[in-house]
Amino acid sequence: MNLPVREFDAVVIGAGGAGMRAALQISQMGLSCALLSKVFPTRSHTVSAQGGITVALGNTHEDNWEWHMYDTVKGSDYIGDQDAIEYMCKTGPEAVLELEHMGLPFSRLDDGSIYQRPFGGQSRNFGGEQAARTAAAADRTGHALLHTLYQQNLKNHTTIFSEWYALDLVKNQDGAVMGCTAICIETGEVVYFKARATVLATGGAGRIYQSTTNAHINTGDGVGMALRAGVPVQDMEMWQFHPTGIAGAGVLVTEGCRGEGGYLLNKHGERFMERYAPNAKDLAGRDVVARSIMIEIREGRGCDGPWGPHAKLKLDHLGKDVLESRLPGILELSRTFAHVDPVKEPIPVIPTCHYMMGGIPTKVTGQVLAVNEQGEDVVIPGLFAVGEIACVSVHGANRLGGNSLLDLIVFGRSAGMHLQESLEEQGATRDASNSDIEASLDRLNRWNSTRSGEDPVEIRKALQACMQHNFSVFREGDAMAKGLEELKVIRERLKNARLDDTSNDFNTQRIECLELDNLMETAYATAVSANFRTESRGAHSRFDYPDRDDDKWLCHTLYQPQTESMTRRKVNMQPKLRPAFPPKVRTY
């Protein structure tokens, strides 16, 4: 098959915060850059980020990037890489002020400086009193970020391909990534995007679960592409369940609500977080708050409702003026999806899948890593990853609120800054052959030639139910082993699924089938990884192994796609500018 070819210095797959920040930096460096997105860029899932960007600006009180680093390392349950966390926290203020200069409309304090609100897990002076570190644009920070970055990419002549779906990476005979193939959703045209640098910025994969804050586009496309290219994925057992999704809908209710003074109640009207986190209370780490809500429900203190047992988030005491000025989006979402007015009554909430802490292992420069037979990190030529799809790892076993947007802009920026230098170090590479390119079309050809078999919608439902029931907030060995066996059966069913719609123009069923392949890859890697880690750490909480085991598990886990087996990778405990923070018991 002779495909049309579009050639660029770099191709960025995904136009959320990380992808657009990387593309902007690449274009500003004078390189030609294609930005591929399966939706219009400002509809990327970053648009739903509400609370803000956590960064030590010191606008509301004295602050220090080292305090931010301490909180992030502690929040990660000590498997966040401290060199990467140091880089993110140290570089963060500069990266955020760049956004301000681009025109991002932050909320303001009375003196005109950027407004910062308290978020969970934040402290002053290495674990002291509560900090207010999260820079916000009301409760629509992600929306403001995407529109700002989109405008800047237009200004800097990034070539944007909206509603193009990346199929798979193209690797040459030497193992270097030489771009990708993609299909135009509007016309069905398939094109080879040739580039010496390919940046995966495809976001999360929360749609492997039944209940998630993630948009329908979050289907783990980058995970699937990486695994099929033989790239390992790291810490895939670590999925954050946000404490406050709207019960019955899964729609996110930002942690900023609790930062502004909201608090959780059980059916007896008790502020139950005082029992689980006496100091931080409702602003403890997200894994702590999510588990606390589920314990209240398991022990019979959950609130009753048509959506099942849940907790209540009380905001009405803050007053109408505060809610309308600082949390206008939450008022709208609550009235639409929960049918309650937070000015008058609490919001029904329950933990729901929110964020993938694991992903593709990378350097601070965004270069994707594998591990050789000697256990050493090696760079995969031509491949980069940034944002939620990447595992730098700054989040470890539990992400702090507001650090996701900081991750996007700091490491999207870093990948763009170092991309040309990385390619120069890589040297000359041979072009991909026709057979290399055709190999990336195998999935598309399989779906296009399948007219009989099982309905992929039913397979997707079965996958999501399996993950929700066996790999949720609390986990247990027998249930996870059973869940893995169920996934093996579902994976076999997927091989015999059918594509009914054979049209070319806006064939959304074809895209959904291709997405289902990626959901399956992501779910399977998650299940194998979760069975492997026999301890409780951060978001990975096991009834049969309730304690953290630093002797055995102070490490990353790596899922190897070729053998579907697990290995370990060392956590980086060597920051460059200050001593490392040693592991301690996490208390809030």
From Swiss-Prot:
Q: How does it sit in the membrane?
A: Peripheral membrane protein
Catalytic activity reported: a quinone + succinate = fumarate + a quinol
Q: Spell out the catalytic residues.
A: R286
Q: Which cofactor does it need?
A: FAD
Co-factor remark: Flavinylated by SdhE, flavinylation occurs at a very low level in the absence of SdhE.
The compartments listed are: Cell inner membrane
- KO phenotype (gene knockout): No effect on anaerobic growth on glycerol fumarate medium.
Where Tele-8alpha-FAD histidine occurs along the chain?
H45
**Keyword entries, A-Z:** Cell inner membrane, Cell membrane, Electron transport, FAD, Flavoprotein, Membrane, Oxidoreductase, Transport, Tricarboxylic acid cycle
The pathway is: Carbohydrate metabolism; tricarboxylic acid cycle; fumarate from succinate (bacterial route): step 1/1
What EC class does the entry list?
A: oxidoreductase
Q: One GO molecular-function annotation for this sequence?
A: succinate dehydrogenase (quinone) activity
Q: E.C. number, please?
A: 1.3.5.1
What does the record say mutating H45S does? No binding of FAD
**Gene Ontology terms describing biological process:** anaerobic respiration; electron transport chain; tricarboxylic acid cycle
Family the entry assigns: Belongs to the FAD-dependent oxidoreductase 2 family. FRD/SDH subfamily.
Function, in words: Two distinct, membrane-bound, FAD-containing enzymes are responsible for the catalysis of fumarate and succinate interconversion; the fumarate reductase is used in anaerobic growth, and the succinate dehydrogenase is used in aerobic growth.
Q: What is this protein called?
A: Succinate dehydrogenase flavoprotein subunit
Q: What is the lineage of its organism?
A: Bacteria, Pseudomonadati, Pseudomonadota, Gammaproteobacteria, Enterobacterales
